Amino acid sequence: MFCLTLTLAAHGWGAGKLTAPELIALAKAHGPELRAGIEATFDAKDLKEGTAWAGQGPEFFFAVEAATAPTLVVDEQPGLPMEALPGSQLWFGIAYVMPVGRLHQFHYVVNGADFGGRLDMPAFGPLSYLQPGVPGGKLSEKLIHTSKIYDGMKSEYWIYVPAQYDPATPVAVMVFQDGGGYIDRTGNNPVLNAVDNLIAQKKIPVMICVFINPGDIADAPGTPTYKAVKGHADRWGRTLKDAMRSTLYDTVSDRYVRFLRDEVLAEVGAKYNLRKDGYSHAITGASSGGICSFNAAWQMPNEFSRVLSLIGSFTSIQWKEDPAVAEGGQDYPDKILREPKRNLRVWLQDGANDMENPRWGSWPLANIRMANALKTRDYDFHFSFGKGTHNGGQGAAEFPEEMVWLWRDYDAAKTAQEYVPDPTEKGKPFFRVSSLNRDEQ
């Protein structure tokens, strides 16, 4: 879609903001600094709308502005009374939310009516926090690549090298689309912590991670790529940068995976000893980055054989935008059914409250179609379908589990493996819409 937004009402980091443990400690002590801490940490809009929260592990802090006493409801469990802050209309509460590594929801009940809340509240597990004694890897400075395949497009990217990397031994590689959203250890998607922990526990192989942002074509006016992207932007009222991202990620062709293979990974491989086999290459992204990752592996399964697609945009965003490309993302379920089977391992994630777009289609139904097509053809796949929106929270909370599943049974002595369905998936039924969110007629 347009961009990946990981929406947390409070990050707890930055000037004046408090972490969830700090807020919880103040709340338990009934310290006089609590009100100032709440007002510094949360936006006034989130407090008024009942969408403010902060969490670490299973411990969560909630704050809301209300004229009368609100009750907090988490995952439809019995309500928790909130405590008033004297001299204000602010209320606060603490909740212990389980299980971790999962997405949760909350809302309030005020005067008998539901109010505020969010459907996307991830509870991160221990593996999303760097564990004691685990060595952290090194993130490069921001690098810039100028593309030939995309006529001078400039892309920002970062290289992450784990502490266990030995230049004498070639290592696996994983490429992250919208990469800048994954490089903050204390952010909404603490991938670096999980990678370090999982490598240390030998649950995934030693790997170099490449975090790449969508490119910018603004400095290459007059080129064929610029003209095509500018045309898409003008037709649909999108910015040039957003249209470039969609052109890269949503187009059903081999152009982007050639860009990764021939330019980006070639550049990274000149500095680090990367394995060349697709068995040792994984790719991931969210939203348009999700379909991008699947498309890259579909086009070149010998380059990428492991796919992690989060809230993937298997919809018609780039359909018929390029006259030379006949298909759109909405065609992938049928392509899976009708075309020769690829040797891929695929984790899909989406939420029941993902988008319904009048131009491009339904994200939840598209992902369900993808899952059923993969199951029909006996692909090695997993579909994690929750209740979330078009938001990265569920994928971020489940990331350690996703990685362990994606890299399970990896053997560095091999360069290939025929993927077969996970035994836990093999006997399960197809996905069905068994209930509707409306009264029966």
Language-model segments: residues:
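Boundary at the C-terminal end of the N-terminal hydrophobic targeting segment
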Residues: A10-G14
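Non-catalytic cap/lid and distal C-terminal segments of serine-dependent acyl enzymes
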Residues: A15-G79, L85-Q441
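Bacterial N-terminal signal peptides
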Residues: M1-A9
